[in-house]
């Protein structure tokens, strides 16, 4: 786009998608995405979920629900804005608690509690994102196409050559690549 540059990874086999984490969620034990990808011998990765920015640069303290391989790694006890993948490799989006995530057979998920980003497309329908603040910023999005491919998008921002993307930009990109959920 005119205001941003980014990278889109298309994962043809959704069973290869997983949540990678730091070894333990404790203040000061965070890692950058590249180091987490190396830890899991992954060929790519994106930031996901919401975390506390404490007094250190890498805090590793998630705020909401985090699940890996069906196990709850972190739970704030409330309802979170969840993005997850089920054991049958379907992308699931919704506001839910840990019990609901288990009921939906979610294998891996991350969440945000402060609703810092909207769901862009749900069941093939572009969501109304008018009035959602945010402007142009670095952005990360995930989507799934009707045939199951996973779309992982990372847009650079706050740089001279890429000030960032809006939520509307992300919605357009996901739709362009055939996302039915994003």
What residue spans do the PLM features occupy?
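Active-site-adjacent helix-turn-beta-strand microarchitecture at beta-sheet edges
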Residues: 51-133
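Structural recognition of the beta-strand scaffold that forms the well-ordered cores
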Residues: 43-47, 84, 92, 143, ...
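Zymogen propeptides
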Residues: 1-77, 81-82, 90-92
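Domain-core and long-helix interface of multi-subunit machines
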Residues: 113-117, 121-178
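Extracellular/periplasmic catalytic domains that process cell-envelope and extracellular macromolecules
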Residues: 37-39, 76-77, 86, 133-136, ...
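Short, solvent-exposed aromatic-acidic interface loops
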Residues: 23-29, 96-102, 155-159
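Solvent-exposed loop/turn segments at secondary-structure junctions
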Residues: 15-16, 50-54, 100, 148, ...
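A short, polar/proline- and glycine-enriched secondary-structure boundary/capping micro-motif
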Residues: 29-31, 102-108, 161-168
């Amino acid at each position: 786009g005119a205001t941003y540059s980014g990278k889109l990874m298309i994962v043809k086999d959704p069973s290869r998608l997983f949540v990678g984490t730091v070894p333990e969620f404790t203040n000061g034990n965070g890692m950058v995405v590249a180091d987490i990808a190396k830890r899991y011998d992954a060929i790519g990765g994106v930031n996901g979920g919401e975390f506390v920015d404490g007094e250190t640069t890498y805090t590793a303290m998630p705020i909401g629900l985090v699940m890996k391989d069906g196990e709850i790694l972190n739970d704030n006890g409330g309802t979170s804005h969840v993005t997850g993948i089920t054991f049958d490799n379907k992308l699931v989006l919704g506001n839910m608690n840990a019990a609901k995530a288990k009921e939906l057979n979610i294998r891996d998920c991350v969440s945000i509690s402060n609703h810092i980003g909207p769901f862009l497309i749900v069941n093939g329908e572009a969501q109304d994102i008018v009035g959602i603040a945010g402007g142009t910023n670095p952005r990360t999005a995930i989507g799934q196409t009707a045939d199951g491919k996973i779309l992982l998008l990372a847009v650079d921002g706050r740089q001279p050559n890429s000030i960032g993307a809006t939520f509307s930009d992300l919605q357009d990109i996901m739709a362009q690549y055939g996302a039915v959920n994003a």
